[in-house]
Amino acid sequence: MNRRKTIVFLGDGMADEPIPELGGKTPLQFARTPGMDQIAREGRSGTLLTLPAGYPTSSEVANMSVLGCDLASEYCGRGPLEAAGRGVALGPDDTAFRVNLVTTGEGILRDFSGGHVAPADAAELIAALNERLGDSRVRFYAGVSYRNILVLSGKDFSPGVRTDKPDDNHGEYVQDHLPVASAPEGETTAALLRELILKAPAVLADHPVNLRLRAEGKPEVNGIWPWSGGRVGALRKLSDKYGVNGAVISAVDVIVGLGRCLGMAVIKVPGATGYIDTNYEGKALAAIEALKTHDFVYLHLEAIDEVSHEQSLKLKIQAIEDFDSRIIVPVLQAVGPAVNCAVLPDHPVPIKMGRHTRTPVPVSARVAGVEPDGVTAFNEVDCLGGALGGMKADGLMRVLLA
């Protein structure tokens, strides 16, 4: 087994499609990315299918795929992973949902992130929801910014509910996307979720946080959107599957929770926000230090995904270049060629759409002793011609750790 240290640089939502304003190039092709290109030049490239048919086009599915999880037996929904990331212990009869704080207007979803509500403001709003709508069986938990958690406790609650992803439904009527049961045992849960969604605006409307936001001319946070519920499951630990001790670096609970469930150490970076104002340098330093004590480091950057959902081409290019120059380049310089490394997105978020697609993502991996394949740039086009070909399932992890 390959015992060399390994780091994966994961740029959430980094892949895209050709854009006319960029002369037909993708943002990855257009951006200046010497660090990513170095990995491509010194390694082998290909593509990885991270969002197979039959599963939601969601980041937890994509990152589970990257990390070699068996979706058929291990996928449990996003909610339990978010809860694990927050340190919320779930019992066997608890059903956990991710719940977004959102902005609506005239019954339409205007912003799935509630204007990227400040974490302190979000915590106040979640506390108000708990006070007015919570009880011994219904509890809200504050996460980071708009990303929060709802836990329903009791045998009569079930994950057998169909919920839609909020970031897929900008501009849609909320009423058209209310939760519905996907199985008979989900009827009670779906009814409660609908009730919470319809009652939340009255709780939030005149909260001091929203009064201040209104006075400042900022988007109000006037609704909730629960989605992707599930019950806690058992994921096979990385140490059992690959014989490595791992660490995860991420600002968002779903990735932190996935890492925890896989037995990885969680490394918190002060100032990591999950947005373009994140602490890039702190993440780079954390990765360098983590490689001294861990075999495998998973460094996840959320910022690119967020600005892609905002459909900001300028900010997407900036976020890609910041990821490269402020994280990847300094880490590569610090660790040298002795460390195996890979770079990839978890899924595409085309700017023109502002939502996830199932297109396989580009990947480049540098593994000691493996001859480069001649690919010299990391992007959606060049990687298609790489020696790794079209990988599925745990293909990347086998390349890096087999």
Residue locations for each model-derived region?
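Feature captures the catalytic ectodomains and active-site-proximal regions of enzymes
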Residues: 1-402
